[in-house]
Amino acid sequence: TFINVKCTSPKQCLKPCKDLYGPHAGEKCMNGKCKCYKV
């Protein structure tokens, strides 16, 4: 799921993804936006 958070590295997506999916969230930074997924 892409979320509306800008990023330059996946670390910036860590907290918003955990807020969305809980402690087992995965995160990527793609095209300057965070992508979250459940693991």
Swiss-Prot record:
The keyword Secreted applies. Disulfide bonds join 7-29, 13-34, 17-36. InterPro entries: Scorpion_toxin-like_sf, Scorpion_toxinS_K_inh. It holds the Pfam family Toxin_2. The keyword Secreted applies. It is found in: Secreted. Keywords: Disulfide bond, Ion channel impairing toxin, Neurotoxin, Pharmaceutical, Potassium channel impairing toxin, Secreted, Toxin, Voltage-gated potassium channel impairing toxin. Expressed by the venom gland. The record marks 28 as: Basic residue of the functional dyad. The record marks 37 as: Aromatic residue of the functional dyad. GO terms for molecular function: ion channel inhibitor activity; potassium channel regulator activity; toxin activity. GO terms for cellular component: extracellular region. Has the structural arrangement of an alpha-helix connected to a beta-sheet by disulfide bonds (CSalpha/beta). Belongs to the short scorpion toxin superfamily. Potassium channel inhibitor family. Alpha-KTx 02 subfamily. Blocks human voltage-gated potassium (Kv) channels Kv1.1/KCNA, Kv1.2/KCNA2 and Kv1.3/KCNA3. Exhibits high affinity for Kv1.2/KCNA2 and selectivity over Kv1.1/KCNA and Kv1.3/KCNA3. This is Potassium channel toxin alpha-KTx 2.24. It comes from Centruroides bonito.
